[in-house]
Each structure stands twice: as C-alpha cells, then as structure tokens.
Amino acid sequence: MISISTMLKGLFLLDPRPYDWIYGAEVRQQIHELVDVYAPLQTRPTVAENPALLGEAEVILSGWGCPQFTEELLAFLPRLRAVFYGAGSIRGIVTEAFWARQIPITTATVANGVPVSEFTIAHIILGLKRYWQHVQRFRETGEWWEHLPVAGAYGSTVGLVSLGTIGQMVAERLKSYEVNVIAYDPFVTQETAAALGVRLCSLEQVFRQADVVSLHTPWLPETEGLITGAHFAAMKEGATFINTARGAVVREAEMIAVLQQRPDLYALLDVTYPEPPAADSPSMRLPNVTISPHIAGALQDECLRNGQSMVEELKRFLNGEPLRYAISRERAARMA
C-alpha cells in the first residue's frame, strides 16, 4: 500500500446510485489503497453548496451525474491532474475551459460497451431466426410446425451501421458465427475493416443486402435523421432492424410508416426519441416493433466492470504509464 503522505488526493464526484453501481465496495477499497480520498462522495448539489471542498483534489473519479467542468467549477480545482470517468460519453461534461487546462480524461467507454455488444449479438442471432415473429405467431395461432422463412446464422448477412467502439466489438464477436458482415462507416479504412472481417459498402447497400441491420451511430448534428424511410423500404423480406445507439439518428415517423406497410420487417429498439416514447406513439402498438427501456448498456452489477476499468487506468496514471482509454478533444466531439 502507498503511504498516505505520498498519495495523491482524490474525490468521488457523481450521483449516489451510479456511485454504488460503478464503484462497489471492492472497487472502492482498491481506490482507497491508491489515492487519499479525503472527503465523502460529492454530488452536484454538494459541490454547488461547498465548491471550496474541491480545492485539494488531484484526481476525480466520476461517472453518471458528474457536473460539467465549466470555467467556474475548474477555478475550484487548481490542483486537478486527471479525471477518471467510469461511464461512456463525456460530451456533456467537458468544455473549452477543460480542454484548455490539458487535463487528461479517461473513460469506461470500452467496458460500458461490452454489455451493449453482448445485447446486440443476442438480438442479431434471434433476429436471424425471426424469433419474435415466431413467438407472436404461435401465441396467436397455436401453429407449431409451420415456420416462417428465416435467414439463420449460416451464410446470412449482418449489416452494421458505424464501426466505432461498439460496432467493432460486435464485428469481433460475429467472427464466431458463419455469417457475412457488411458495414457502413465513412471514417474506417479498408485495412481496419479487413481486420474485423467486414466488407465496407454504402449505407443503402447495408439496408438492401443485410438480413439484420444493427445501428451503432452516435447522435451528432450531422447524423440526426441519418436513417430514413427509404432505407427501411429497401430492406429484404423478413429483415430485422436493431437500434442500441440513439433514437434521433432515425427518422422515426418515416420508420413507422414503412413498418406499418411492411409487416414482414421487425424493429428492435432499445432507444427512442424522445425517451421514453410518448404513450400514444404508434411504435408502442405496432406488432412488429419491440421496445426495451434503454437497457443494452451496463446496468447494476455490470457497472462494476466500468469501475474496475478505472482502477486499472488509475494504476497506469500513478505509474506514469499512458492511459489506455484516454479521450482526446477530437474524439470527444464524435461521441454519442
């Protein structure tokens, strides 16, 4: 154990519930052995009430509920040397003032992406079997032996829209299956795609050729409404659409219109826009739409992976090693 006198001073700064989820007892114990956590958990309300308490903090361990690092807040953090954010996107917490200070920030984006990729793979395989349609048909008719046409997980085609952190995780996991993987991502090189076992093509080709299309595009001004009704109308007979990214990337009204006309298609939506969807939204009633309440990412004990990821990053920082998951200003701008 490092001597208290030589430890950097640190604080936990996030909401109470994610604090318990991300930084469980075992994770907190490891952190307390590495840094001098000199005050109890801090939240946005406690910081607003007593910002001077931040003055000694050299490292901050955070997550969902972290306040934005504004110029005003940073004025109370003169000794801050690094931020360890045990969740995903940091777009909502970083500012120009933060980047101007050149403070390293690392995140649990990769750890948080693991359950999303697992969730997606499960949906892909079930989608290739048209599982939900078969369940619904059996409930309605009792028919056991008459199966719908299925693509199956042999020689079928899976389409990925965007090959960011999670899209690449999904592609890696799909190597275990005998399926063809195509993807649209204008920022990915042919070399990267080849290493992932993916063939790059246009967005239109992904929707036309894939038996299952999985969306992994971050919600940015330039991607809002990227997926249109024309894309859905072009999908193969019996194809499945999965969205674990952000609802606003899809033009929902156009999607719904096509799904109403094409009962052979199926949409699995873990995200909507807005969230939750309006009670009178047609998507809540369509038989070929299943909505889950944004559960693909890390939940409850799964969040401990995020915390452990931050422990390992903290060790690297204290040892003077490069941070494995550090986020640059440029990358932060492309995060969801």
Question: Model segments located where?
Answer:
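Short beta->alpha connector loops at strand-helix junctions that form conserved
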Residues: 86-87, 104-111, 203-204, 245, ...
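N-terminal glycine-/charge-rich "phosphate-binding" loop or analogous flexible N-terminal tail
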Residues: 1-59, 334-336
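Rossmann-like dinucleotide/phosphate-binding beta-alpha-beta segment
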Residues: 146-237, 241
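Structural alpha-helical scaffold elements that stabilize or flank donor/cofactor-binding regions
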Residues: 31, 52-53, 73-76, 205-209, ...
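Rossmann-like dinucleotide-binding domain for NAD(H)/NADP(H)
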Residues: 105-106, 229, 237-336
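Phosphate-binding beta-alpha-beta segment of Rossmann-like dinucleotide-binding domains, i.e.
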Residues: 103, 108-157, 169-172
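Short glycine-/small-residue-rich Rossmann-like dinucleotide-binding loops
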Residues: 65, 88, 211, 217-219, ...
